[in-house]
Design a protein with these regions (language model features):
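Alpha-helical interface subdomain recognition
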Residues: 1, 69-74, 85-90, 94-242
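Active-site beta-strand/loop segments that form the cofactor-binding cradle
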Residues: 2, 6-8, 12-15, 27, ...
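A short core secondary-structure module
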Residues: 4-52
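Solvent-exposed alpha-helices and their adjacent loops that cap or buttress functional pockets
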Residues: 12-17, 30-34, 59-64, 84, ...
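Short, solvent-exposed loop/turn segments at the edges of secondary structure
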Residues: 16-18, 35, 65-67, 208, ...
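Short, solvent-exposed coil/turn linker segments
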Residues: 32, 43, 77-78, 132, ...
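Flexible, small-/acidic-enriched active-site or ligand-binding loops
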Residues: 45-76
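Cytochrome P450 core scaffold surrounding the K-helix E-X-X-R motif
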Residues: 51, 81-86
Length: 242
């Protein structure tokens, strides 16, 4: 195989322990859409593979893990380096993305719980105008709504996991897409409330909240942006009435 092209945001390629890439390439542009791509193993470092630069995410390079911009210039690898066979790249990706998305959402629930904990501790420990912050400005509602929304999303994640176990990843895609939209957005909302409760401290390096927020905001793009998942959900719903 001879590989040419480039890609941005190749996560993990900056880590010195990264010695092999699973590279998604077009091997048959004339095939049906889901059979055009293949996955090929490319060692690192390797002739023709140029790591151009680390891509920044919200101003940080995320070293040493990194999200790299990489170019491939006539990269020649043995034909045996293909995974499963020609045209099966999309199939492989789809098999990974469902479990990957639900894993992201499970971790996001944990992030939301941590943010709510920090919010509550701050609300009880900080006073203003002779009262704790919890008693001011409708903050009871903020705390209550955060708990409600976290638990709603947790149940949605559990349902998606159940559907994956019972009907399979492909058939459960509506439920997977639903949590991929709902959970990061919910978590961002809880983190934002926690930041607001902390004031300037919330965006400083002295709490994890700023890093939590950037991670969850990035997750709305990783493994498919919200808009793509909403399209999946809507199309699956409409199928019931066509």
């Amino acid at each position: 195989w001879v590989i040419n092209g480039e890609k941005h945001y190749i996560s993990g390629a900056g880590d010195p322990r990264c010695k092999i890439m699973i590279t998604m390439v077009v091997t048959n542009p004339d095939a049906p859409k889901h059979l055009r791509q293949s996955q090929i193993l490319v060692p690192l470092p390797y002739p023709g593979v140029e790591v151009v630069r680390p891509m920044y995410v919200f101003g940080k390079d995320d070293a040493p893990h990194g999200h790299m911009h990489i170019k491939f210039d006539n990269v020649r690898v043995p034909k045996e380096n293909i995974i499963l066979g020609e045209g099966r790249g999309f199939e492989i990706s789809q098999g990974r993305l469902g479990p990957g998305r639900i894993h992201h959402c499970m971790r996001s629930i944990g992030v939301a719980e941590r943010a709510l904990e920090l919010l509550c501790r701050r609300a009880l420990s900080r006073t203003a105008f002779g009262k704790s912050l919890a008693e001011l400005g409708g903050n009871y509602d903020v705390i209550a709504n955060s708990r409600i929304e976290i638990d709603m999303c947790r149940l949605a994640v559990l349902k998606a996991a159940y559907m994956m176990d019972t009907i399979g990843n492909k058939e459960a895609r509506k439920y997977i897409s639903a949590i991929k939209v709902a959970v990061p957005n919910m978590t961002l909302k809880v983190i934002d409330s926690a930041i607001q409760m902390h004031g300037a401290l919330g965006v400083s390096q002295d709490t994890p909240l700023a890093a939590m927020w950037t991670g969850q905001r990035t997750l709305r793009l990783a493994d498919g942006p919200d808009e793509v998942h909403r399209r999946v959900i809507a199309r699956e719903e409409l199928k019931q009435y066509q």
